UniProtKB/Swiss-Prot annotation:
Provenance organism: Lycosa singoriensis (Wolf spider)
Propiece residue ranges: 21-26
GO molecular function: toxin activity
Listed name of the protein: U8-lycotoxin-Ls1g
Entry comment describing in which tissues the protein is expressed: Expressed by the venom gland.
Transcription regulation listed as a keyword: no
Predominant localisation class: secreted
Post-translational modification note: Contains 4 disulfide bonds.
Keyword Signal annotated: yes
Length: 77
């Protein structure tokens, strides 16, 4: 009985380690990629910045992109 419980715990630990490793290996989003649905997936040197979209003063949506940390983007005329 103890052997069955021990074997079950060992298998559980192995499966847990495999899942954690798979999460750590997930690809990060590179610069300028859309991160609206996954704000935490930008690569380490990037941050997910979101901007509202407006038409005639009414908000019509939101866009989020992986951009460099500390960089300010301004609209050019």
């Amino acid at each position: 009985m103890k052997l069955i419980i021990f074997t079950g715990l060992v298998l559980f630990a192995i499966v847990s380690l495999i899942e954690v490793q798979a999460d750590n290996e997930r690809a990060c989003l590179p610069q300028y990629q859309v991160c609206t649905d996954a704000p935490g997936n930008c690569c380490s040197n990037l941050v997910c910045n979101c901007y509202g979209r407006y038409k005639s003063g009414a908000r019509i949506g939101r866009n989020c992109f992986c951009l460099q940390k500390g960089v300010i983007y301004k609209r050019e005329n």
